[in-house]
Amino acid sequence: FAFSNRLSTTIFYASSVLIFFIFYGIFIYLGTKKKINLKEIFILLGMTAAILVLSYPAILSYDIFNYVATSKVLFFYHENPYVIMPIEFIGDPLLAFTHAANKIALYAPFWLLLTGIPYLLGLGNFIVILFSFKLFSILFYLGSAFLIWKISRNVLSLILFSFNPLIVIETLVSGHNDIAMIFLALFSFFLLS
């Protein structure tokens, strides 16, 4: 659809980003004027996550499919994803979704072990696995928001991170793993404080 309807896709994308920035500005305003409290922020975060978990991650990136494929190499085929590429499993239906099937694992072993959680929770069903990975990203997002609050005790800091359109789109829509690294960094700061 996107390639054959570029104008519609562009308008939809630009409108979506504009809406994210409008809400971001509203939340920042409410935070600076102290017209929004912590409970309301976390309710809004939960609602945002609940809505965007249903968004299709390949709108902007195919990375989540690559995470699934790498996990499948390790946890389904029981092969070393640092040696064996997903493309070597000819006929695997997941290959139709990945755009980096010709690459070995790109991330550290700890990330691969973490991806075993959503992969195994998916019980071999592609759709369930995909949404398990998105839910995994959401948990790291909510955990990061919580840690920012615990570290800063500042509502505006929480808003600046949690409703940032880049964070929201890349985490809740695309399901990128950067949020896991953010969470772990924040967790280390939390332990130091």
Give the predicted meaning of each segment.
Residues 41-132:
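Intramembrane catalytic core of multi-pass membrane enzymes that act on lipidic substrates
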Residues 46-50, 164-166, 185-187:
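Hydrophobic, membrane-inserted alpha-helices
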Residues 54, 125-130, 134, 141, ...:
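Aromatic- and kink-enriched transmembrane "portal" helix at the membrane-lumen/periplasm boundary
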Residues 21-31, 131-155, 182-183:
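Transmembrane-helix motifs of polytopic, lipid-linked glycan transferases
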